[in-house]
C-alpha cells in the first residue's frame, strides 16, 4: 500500500514536472524559438558582405553556437536566473533587488534605478518589434510557395497582428493551454529539419570548434564586430527566460532549455548552414528552403502559429512589467483587468495594449519586411541585456556578497560580450534602429518624470504640514463634534496630518469616532505575507495609524486588507467606514526641483492617471474626495 502510494505520488510529481516544462516551452521560448526564421537570412543578405562560402558559413555558425552557449546557457541559465526576487524575475524585480543592494550608496542606487528604467523602456520597444518581425518572417514564407504573392505579405501580417491585439481583453486562458504543445511541436520540427539538412552536408558539424569563430574575425577584421549585430538576432528572447521565471521557476526553464530548445536551435541553424554550403542562393530564405517542397505550406502555418505565440508572450510580459512598475511607483496608475479567475498573473491593461498595437502596425507598414526590421531589433535586445548585466553586478557584489576575485572576472566577461553586441548595433540606429531608441527615450522620460514628480509632490504637500501629535493635542483642548463610524484618510506620510483631514475639519467641523491615518507602503519584494501586511498604532482619542504593506505583484485591495487589522476598538464595518482621499491638482511653476515643461508633463500624467479609488479597490459609495492645488 505504502509502496503503491509512493509510486502514485512519484508519478504525479513527474507529470507535474513535465507539464511545467511544456508550459515553459510555450511561454518562455517563443521569441528565441522563432529566431531561426530570420537570423541566417539577415546575416547573409543584410548587407554585411559575409561570403556564402565554406569558411564564411562555418564561421557564422560557430559564432551563433558559442553566443547561445555563453549568453543564454552560461549567463542567463547559470547566473541571471539565480537573481530572483522571492521567485520573481524581470527588469523591475531585478531593479528592486539592485535598489536594496545599493541602499547604503545613494548615488549608486540612483544609477541602478536609471539602468532599470532604461532596460524597461527598451523592453517596451522590443514588445513592439517582436510581433512585427516574427509574424512578417513567418508570412514571408508564402512567397516561396506562390509566385506574385509578395505584395500580400504586409496585409496578411497586419490582419494576424491586429486580431492578436483585439483578443487580448478576453484573455488567453483557454487557448493558452495549446501554446505549450504547439511550441514543442515547433521545436521538434526545427530539430527534424536541421537533421535533414546536416545529413546532406555533415561538414557543418566542424563549426562546433570555436576556432572557426576566431578565424572569421581574423579573416574579416573589418566585418567581425559589425556582424555581431546580426548574430545577436539568434539571442532575441533570452531576457524572457528571466522575465517569466515567476510563472514557472528556474528549474523547469533550465531543463526545457537544455533538453529541447538548445538542441533544436543548434540543429536547425546547422541544417540551414548545410543547405547554404550546397546552394549559396538559398541565402534568400535558408529556413524555408531547408524544408522539402511538400512541407512548405504546413511549415508556414506552423511558423505563423509559433510567431503568434511568441508575440503573445511578449505582450503578456509588457502587461506584467507595467503592473510591477506601477506598484513600484515608476508608471502612472492604470486600470488593470484580470482575464482569468484562476490565474492571478493573467491581466490586461488597455492603455498598454493599444499603444503596442499602434506601434506594431506602424512598424509593419513602415519597414514592410523582416529583414528591414532586423536592424531595429538588435538595439533593443542588446540594450536590455546590457542593463540586466549592470543590475546583476550590483546584486552579486553587494547583496550576495560574492568574493570580488570570483565575481569580477565573470562580470567582466558578461559586460565585454554584451558591450560588443551593443556596439555592433549602434551603427544600426541610422538604419532603423532609431525606433527602439526613440521609443525607449520617450518612455524613460515619462517614467523618470513621473517618479521625480511624485517625490516633489510629496515634498510640497509636506511643507508646512502639521505633526500628528500636535493635532491630537489641539483636539483634546477643543474637542470637535464626533459622529459615529470610521473615517479612513489615505496619506503618504504617516507622521503628519493629511490635507483631507484638515479640509474636513475646516468645512464640516466634525470628526468620526474613529479616525484612521492609512499609508500604503510598496515593498521591493513581489509579495508580502498576510501576517506582515499591516502595522497598527493607537494614539488615543480614537486616532489610529495603519501601515499596509504590499509587494509589487500583490493586488493593493485596501478594504480586504483592513479586514485583517485586529485591534480592540478598531471597526472597519463596510457600511460604517468612509474613505477620505486628497485629489491634487498640480500647477507647474518656476520653483526648484523640476523644469517647467517637465512640470507640465507631470501634471498631464497625474490628471490622466487612475486615482486611488479604483487602484485600491475602494467602494465607490463610501469615498469622499477633497481637492487641493500644489505648485511644483
Swiss-Prot record:
Database matches in InterPro entries: K+_transporter, K_trans_C, K_trans_N, Kup
Q: Does the keyword Transport apply?
A: yes
Task: List the GO molecular function terms.
Answer: potassium ion transmembrane transporter activity; symporter activity
Task: Give the Pfam families listed for this entry.
Answer: K_trans (PF02705), K_trans_C (PF22776)
**What residue ranges are annotated as transmembrane?**
20-40, 60-80, 111-131, 146-166, 178-198, 216-236, 257-277, 289-309, 347-367, 379-399, 404-424, 429-449
Which transformation does this protein catalyse, written as a reaction? K(+)(in) + H(+)(in) = K(+)(out) + H(+)(out)
> Is this entry keyworded Cell inner membrane?
yes
Going by the entry's taxonomy, the superkingdom of the source organism is recorded as: Bacteria
Q: What's its membrane topology?
A: Multi-pass membrane protein
This protein's UniProt keywords: Cell inner membrane, Cell membrane, Ion transport, Membrane, Potassium, Potassium transport, Symport, Transmembrane, Transmembrane helix, Transport
The compartments listed are: Cell inner membrane
Major localisation:
membrane
- Annotated GO CC locations: plasma membrane
Q: What does this protein do?
A: Transport of potassium into the cell. Likely operates as a K(+):H(+) symporter.
Q: What PANTHER family does its record include? A: LOW AFFINITY POTASSIUM TRANSPORT SYSTEM PROTEIN KUP (PTHR30540:SF79), OSMOTIC STRESS POTASSIUM TRANSPORTER (PTHR30540)
Hey, which family's this protein in?
Answer: Belongs to the HAK/KUP transporter (TC 2.A.72) family.
Please identify the protein, giving its name as recorded: Probable potassium transport system protein Kup
Q: What is the taxonomic lineage of the source species? A: Bacteria, Pseudomonadati, Pseudomonadota, Gammaproteobacteria, Pseudomonadales
Amino acid at each position: 500500500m505504502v509502496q503503491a502510494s509512493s509510486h502514485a505520488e512519484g508519478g504525479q510529481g513527474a507529470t507535474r514536472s513535465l507539464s511545467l516544462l511544456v508550459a515553459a516551452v510555450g511561454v518562455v521560448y517563443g521569441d528565441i524559438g522563432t529566431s531561426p526564421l530570420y537570423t541566417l537570412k539577415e546575416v547573409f543578405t543584410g548587407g554585411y558582405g559575409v561570403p556564402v562560402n565554406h569558411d564564411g558559413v562555418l564561421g557564422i555558425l560557430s559564432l551563433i553556437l558559442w553566443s547561445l552557449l555563453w549568453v543564454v546557457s552560461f549567463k542567463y541559465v547559470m547566473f541571471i536566473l539565480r537573481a530572483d526576487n522571492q521567485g520573481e524575475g524581470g527588469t523591475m524585480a531585478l531593479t528592486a533587488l539592485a535598489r536594496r543592494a545599493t541602499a547604503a550608496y545613494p548615488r549608486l542606487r540612483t544609477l541602478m534605478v536609471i539602468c532599470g528604467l532604461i532596460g524597461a523602456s527598451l523592453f517596451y520597444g522590443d514588445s513592439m518589434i517582436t510581433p512585427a518581425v516574427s509574424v512578417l518572417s513567418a508570412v514571408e514564407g508564402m512567397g516561396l510557395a506562390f509566385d506574385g504573392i509578395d505584395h500580400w505579405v504586409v496585409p496578411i501580417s497586419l490582419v494576424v497582428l491586429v486580431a492578436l491585439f483585439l483578443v487580448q481583453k478576453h484573455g488567453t486562458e483557454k487557448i493558452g493551454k495549446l501554446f505549450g504543445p504547439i511550441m514543442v511541436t515547433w521545436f521538434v520540427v526545427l530539430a527534424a529539419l536541421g537533421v535533414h539538412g546536416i545529413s546532406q552536408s555533415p561538414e557543418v558539424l566542424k563549426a562546433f570548434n570555436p576556432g572557426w569563430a576566431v578565424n572569421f574575425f581574423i579573416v574579416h577584421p573589418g566585418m567581425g564586430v559589425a556582424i555581431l549585430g546580426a548574430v545577436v538576432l539568434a539571442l532575441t528572447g533570452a531576457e524572457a527566460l528571466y522575465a517569466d521565471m515567476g510563472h514557472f521557476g528556474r528549474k523547469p526553464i533550465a531543463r526545457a532549455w537544455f533538453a529541447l530548445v538548445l538542441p533544436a536551435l543548434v540543429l536547425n541553424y546547422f541544417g540551414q548552414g548545410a543547405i547554404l554550403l550546397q546552394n549559396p542562393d538559398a541565402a534568400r530564405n535558408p529556413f524555408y528552403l531547408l524544408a522539402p517542397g511538400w512541407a512548405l505550406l504546413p511549415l508556414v502555418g506552423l511558423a505563423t502559429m509559433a510567431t503568434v505565440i511568441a508575440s503573445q508572450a511578449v505582450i503578456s510580459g509588457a502587461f506584467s512589467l507595467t503592473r510591477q512598475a506601477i506598484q513600484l511607483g515608476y508608471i502612472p496608475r492604470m486600470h488593470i483587468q484580470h482575464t482569468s479567475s484562476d490565474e492571478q498573473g493573467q491581466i490586461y491593461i488597455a492603455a498598454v495594449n493599444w499603444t503596442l498595437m499602434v506601434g506594431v502596425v506602424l512598424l509593419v507598414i513602415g519597414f514592410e519586411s523582416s529583414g528591414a526590421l532586423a536592424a531595429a531589433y538588435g538595439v533593443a535586445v542588446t540594450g536590455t541585456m546590457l542593463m540586466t548585466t549592470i543590475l546583476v553586478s550590483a546584486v552579486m557584489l553587494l547583496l550576495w556578497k560574492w568574493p570580488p576575485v570570483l565575481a569580477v572576472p565573470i562580470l567582466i566577461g558578461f559586460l565585454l560580450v554584451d558591450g560588443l553586441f551593443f556596439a555592433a548595433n549602434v551603427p544600426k540606429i541610422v538604419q532603423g534602429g532609431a525606433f527602439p531608441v526613440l521609443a525607449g527615450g520617450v518612455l524613460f522620460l515619462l517614467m523618470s518624470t513621473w517618479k521625480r514628480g511624485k517625490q516633489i509632490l510629496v515634498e510640497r504637500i509636506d511643507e508646512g504640514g502639521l505633526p500628528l501629535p500636535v493635532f491630537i493635542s489641539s483636539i483634546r483642548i477643543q474637542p470637535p463634534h464626533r459622529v459615529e463610524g470610521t473615517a479612513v484618510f489615505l496619506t503618504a506620510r504617516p507622521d503628519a496630518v493629511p490635507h483631507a483631514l484638515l479640509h474636513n475639519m475646516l468645512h464640516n467641523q466634525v470628526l468620526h469616532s474613529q479616525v484612521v491615518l492609512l499609508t500604503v507602503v510598496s515593498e521591493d519584494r513581489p509579495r508580502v505575507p498576510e501576517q506582515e501586511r499591516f502595522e497598527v498604532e493607537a494614539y488615543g482619542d480614537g486616532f489610529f495609524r495603519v501601515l499596509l504593506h504590499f509587494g509589487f505583484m500583490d493586488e493593493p485591495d485596501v478594504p480586504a486588507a483592513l479586514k485583517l487589522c485586529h485591534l480592540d476598538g478598531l471597526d472597519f464595518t463596510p457600511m460604517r467606514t468612509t474613505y477620505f482621499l486628497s485629489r491634487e491638482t498640480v500647477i507647474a511653476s518656476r520653483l526648484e526641483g523640476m523644469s517647467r515643461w517637465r512640470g507640465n508633463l507631470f501634471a498631464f500624467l497625474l490628471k490622466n492617471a487612475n486615482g486611488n479609488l479604483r487602484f485600491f479597490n475602494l467602494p465607490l459609495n463610501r469615498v469622499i474626495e477633497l481637492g487641493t492645488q500644489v505648485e511644483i
